[in-house]
Swiss-Prot record:
Keyword Transmembrane helix appears in the UniProt entry: yes
SH3 domain sequence ranges: 236-296
Transmembrane segments: 24-44, 55-77, 84-106, 111-131
The gene coding this protein: SHO1
Name of the featured protein: High osmolarity signaling protein SHO1
Positions in coiled-coil regions: none
């Protein structure tokens, strides 16, 4: 399984709004920082008053490093690069904090009680982060959480090019990629392999005639194929969808399209995470399915 590539130059600029526009991260990180301060101060006082489990200190230091790292990856917009690291890191932090809670919760004194309360809260936040960063952005829970973000849902980590879209095969073309770049995605009319099922053996002498999107002869985009005296009309974009959020296409994927919130799109191939779509201006490309909703 391949993963999408990101441009370092486009993704490495510091922008704090990447963090502040995500209420889930702001809320959980704030709770974690307050919990860490409580646990740290309680641990200092408990250590002064008497014996204190020394391994807890390393757990608190490791937790602090992870807490500092999280806002950094958001501000530089490189979260997708470090999802695996975040999942593993917070899993380790969860083990440390739960172990510290076990040692502290049964100890007497108000200081150890405060420290145990802090590490218990940290354990809860760590577990939430493990589930969140360990899940794909297209999962139902992540989509629900990201729906509160001002930037909208995040991209799925599954590559749209290799895993979601059917590729049109041309027996006269030497390369599928070349056909894709020079034929399908330069606003030329094309037909997917799904639509051509059973019609692949059209001879060179047969004619292929395409009807424009806004043609008065058809309500939707259609393709007329004349093969052996047979007329067949196929609607390439039979569905209509409305954009739920603004979407800016990735600079590294020329097959994507940008669109604005509430824009109406014509789509097909709705059984995957990335849909083939056509804008009103005739631009054709792919869009993430969690950014749009079908209206007919």
């Amino acid at each position: 399984m391949s993963t999408p590539e990101y441009s370092t130059s486009a993704k490495s600029r510091f922008d704090i709004t990447n963090l502040t526009t995500d209420p889930f991260v702001v809320a959980t990180w704030s709770v974690a920082m307050i919990s860490w301060v409580i646990a740290f101060i309680g641990s200092i006082v408990a250590n002064i008053e008497g014996s204190f489990p020394r391994f807890t200190w390393w757990g608190l230091v490791f937790q602090l490093l992870m807490l500092v790292f999280l806002p950094a990856v958001y501000c530089f917009d490189v979260v997708e690069w470090y999802r695996l690291f975040l999942t593993c890191g917070y899993s380790i932090a969860f083990i440390y904090t739960t172990n510290s809670a076990t040692n502290l919760v049964w100890s007497g004194g108000s200081a150890t009680g405060a420290a145990s309360a802090g590490v218990i809260l940290l354990s809860m936040v760590n577990l939430i982060w493990v589930f969140y960063y360990g899940s794909d952005n297209a999962s139902p829970i992540n989509q629900w959480i990201d729906s509160f973000s001002l930037r909208g849902p995040k991209r799925s980590s599954v590559s749209p090019f290799h895993n979601s879209r059917p590729i049109s095969h041309d027996k006269y073309s030497g390369s599928e990629n070349d056909e894709f770049k020079h034929s399908s995605w330069n606003n030329q009319r094309y037909m997917s392999s799904t639509a051509l099922s059973g019609l692949e053996n059209v001879s060179q002498g047969d004619t292929l005639e395409t009807t424009p999107f806004n043609s008065p002869d058809h309500d939707g985009l259609g393709t007329n194929i004349t093969a052996g005296g047979t007329n067949i009309t196929i609607d390439e974009f039979p569905y209509t969808a409305r954009a739920l959020y603004n979407y800016q296409k990735s600079p590294d994927d020329e097959n994507e399209i940008s669109f604005e919130k509430d824009e109406i799109l014509k789509v097909n191939d709705i059984h995957s995470r990335w849909w083939q779509a056509k804008r009103a201006n005739g631009e054709i490309g792919i869009c993430p399915s969690n950014y749009v909703e079908l209206i007919e």
